[in-house]
Amino acid sequence: DPNIQGIDELVINEESSKKALNFFKKNKCDKIVIFQTTFTDAKFILHFANVINKPICILAFPEPRTGGRLRLNSLCGLNLGMHSLIKNQIVPNFIIINKNKIFYTKKLNNFNKSKYFNNKIENWKKLSLGKNKKPLKEIKNQKIGIIGIRPDGFDTCDYNSREIKEKLNFNIKKLSLNNLFTESKKINKNNIKKTKFLITKDLKGTKDLNQKELEKSISIYHGLENIRKKHDLNAFAVRCWPEMFTEYGCASCGPMAMMNEKKISCACEADVLGSISCNILNQLNGKPSLLVDIVDLDDKDNSVVFWHCGLAPISMSKKGEARVGIHSNRQKPLLHDFRLKPGKITIFRVSKSANKLKFFLIKGEIQNRKNSFSGTSGVVSLGNNTS
């Protein structure tokens, strides 16, 4: 089609993003289709949308449920990008490609013909706690430790300290990653060996891991526990990469899963609102909770796949099924690797989409299916809760 033009290479870094932006500055288009082929942060898509200022449609792709590494993670990239754009008053169209070619072709044609865009922002402002001046008295006063700063382009992890205190009854203690690394290096080797022996009872395959890296990972668990006691903390939001790999030499997923088991909620990417969400669930139901990504969906049975690298507490596994894992990005332990056990669940998130604090709450049920991807995951039926 002579009316369609575009770039023929992936946007993977600063150089390629500038090249793509310059192309569309020179070649004027009425509308833009962005292929979210894999997971990325939202820096480029936000900057691109602001500069080009044209209607945007983002396409995400299904993820083959191989039981192995999560390779595309396209849907998660779509979620992150949409959140960032909506937060900045930009509401793009989006399409999740499925096997029904007629369906997504029709969606694309509708986007192409439509004269309207970015006119839905009011729909995202309706569900908010913006007018609620009172804190949640039913939730006990809590204190969350933020270790490190959230990665660039992860706008979902933003927070307002005053708002968290006034509306959610949470105080904040900021710490550096070096605080955690220093504390973890001081852990007695005997304590590390005792913990390694204990987790071997629940996790298969510990002997197959690099023992030095495994012990480093266990030391992070003890480091978190010592910091928790020192500062009287109830939850953590931790910058889990890349420094955990590159500077300390292990993954933090397993240690954080162990803290989650103790109902000390731990969220990756220094996601403060994510950790607060888990903490509130812990208080309400007295059981461990888990922060997850939505990485795949099936519109035929209205189900989604909840996943994270290896962050799920051991009690969420069926007895005898839990194994150790190594992180797919850096090949380092410790991760939990198992499917989430079947049963009814509460899905809850404190969110700040469209710059308004709000609660997302829905019921779900984990299905009795095999692990969709390495790490910890579950296929969750949403029943008639959504359409």
Which residues fall in each region the model found?
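Metallocofactor- and cofactor-centric catalytic cores in central/energy metabolism, strongly enriched
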Residues: D1-I146, R150-A235
